[in-house]
């Protein structure tokens, strides 16, 4: 721990805490001060100026994928169920699958449902809600377009959501990735985030933006 602490402090010493860096310089700096051997995730932390009634939640497909493919579970019947299977969902079913999840099955990362299934799927609220997996129209996981939705999820469609304090954390890459690809992911995420600015919000939407690696210190981004 002492050795890691020393390396962390050495990394911090290379960051000008009074300076806001361009995204290009920030990514380069994160790689320069990296002190662990494993492939760290590059994360963005954003402080938003939100009122209590504001919700910022959506999804984005990043141009450069870096996460392992997620296991998709779909609640659907009949032709829709067949469509989901053909689209590549890992698990597809209706009442049988609902009962399986009730019984403790949890080997999945994303849940999608057709609108007609939501009355029964809603009963799984205590289970799915706890994991943040309850289907929701805002994240396009309640849909009849299963083919399109599953295709998007397989391409890496990822949800972003601000918490009650207006803080939004999102991963944009891995330290092993080319700097340009990390920046492209960052730019795409920011573009989609800005579309979610509440219509009645006055003043600044984004208060501050920081970028960091899994084990490293954060670097402030010059966000205009």
Swiss-Prot record:
Task: Name one molecular function that GO assigns to this entry.
Answer: structural constituent of ribosome
Return any one Pfam family short name: Ribosomal_L1
Keyword Ribosomal protein listed? The answer is yes
State the InterPro entries in the record: Ribosom_uL1_bac-type, Ribosomal_uL1, Ribosomal_uL1-like, Ribosomal_uL1/biogenesis, Ribosomal_uL1_3-a/b-sand, Ribosomal_uL1_CS
Q: Which Gene3D superfamilies match?
A: 3.30.190.20, 3.40.50.790
**Record bears the keyword Transport:** no
**Range of residues in the leader sequence:** none
Q: Keywords for this entry?
A: Repressor, Ribonucleoprotein, Ribosomal protein, RNA-binding, rRNA-binding, Translation regulation, tRNA-binding
GO CC terms of this entry: large ribosomal subunit
Cystine links in this protein are: none
SUPFAM superfamilies, alphabetized: Ribosomal protein L1
The highest taxon in the source lineage is Bacteria
Can you supply a Gene Ontology BP term from the record? regulation of translation
Spell out the CDD domains in the cross-references. Answer: Ribosomal_L1
Subunit structure, per the record? Part of the 50S ribosomal subunit.
Q: What does this protein do?
A: Binds directly to 23S rRNA. The L1 stalk is quite mobile in the ribosome, and is involved in E site tRNA release. Protein L1 is also a translational repressor protein, it controls the translation of the L11 operon by binding to its mRNA.
Cross-referenced HAMAP family: Ribosomal_uL1_B
> Which family would the database say this protein is a member of?
Belongs to the universal ribosomal protein uL1 family.
Q: What is the protein's given name?
A: Large ribosomal subunit protein uL1
Per the UniProt record, the source organism is Borrelia hermsii (strain HS1 / DAH)
Q: Which gene encodes it?
A: rplA
């Amino acid at each position: 721990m002492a050795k890691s602490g020393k390396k962390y402090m050495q990394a911090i010493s290379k960051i000008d805490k009074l300076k806001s860096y361009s995204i290009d310089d920030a990514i380069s700096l994160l790689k320069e001060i990296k002190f662990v051997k494993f492939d760290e995730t590059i994360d963005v932390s954003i402080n938003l100026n939100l009122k209590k009634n504001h919700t910022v939640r959506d999804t984005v497909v990043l141009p450069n994928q870096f996460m392992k493919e997620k296991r998709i579970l779909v609640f659907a019947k009949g032709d829709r169920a067949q469509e989901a299977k053909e689209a590549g969902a890992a698990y597809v079913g209706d009442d049988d699958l609902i009962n399986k999840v009730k019984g403790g099955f949890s080997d999945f990362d994303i849940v999608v449902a057709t609108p007609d299934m939501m009355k029964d799927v809603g009963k799984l609220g205590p289970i799915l809600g706890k994991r943040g997996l309850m289907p929701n129209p805002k994240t396009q996981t309640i849909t009849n377009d299963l083919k399109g939705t599953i295709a998007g999820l397989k391409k890496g469609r990822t949800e972003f959501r601000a918490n009650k304090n207006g803080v939004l954390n999102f991963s944009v890459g891995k330290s092993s990735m080319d700097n340009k690809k990390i920046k492209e992911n960052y730019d795409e995420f920011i573009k989609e985030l800005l579309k979610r600015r509440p219509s009645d919000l006055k003043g600044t939407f984004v208060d501050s933006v920081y970028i960091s690696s899994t084990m490293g210190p954060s670097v402030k981004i010059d966000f205009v």
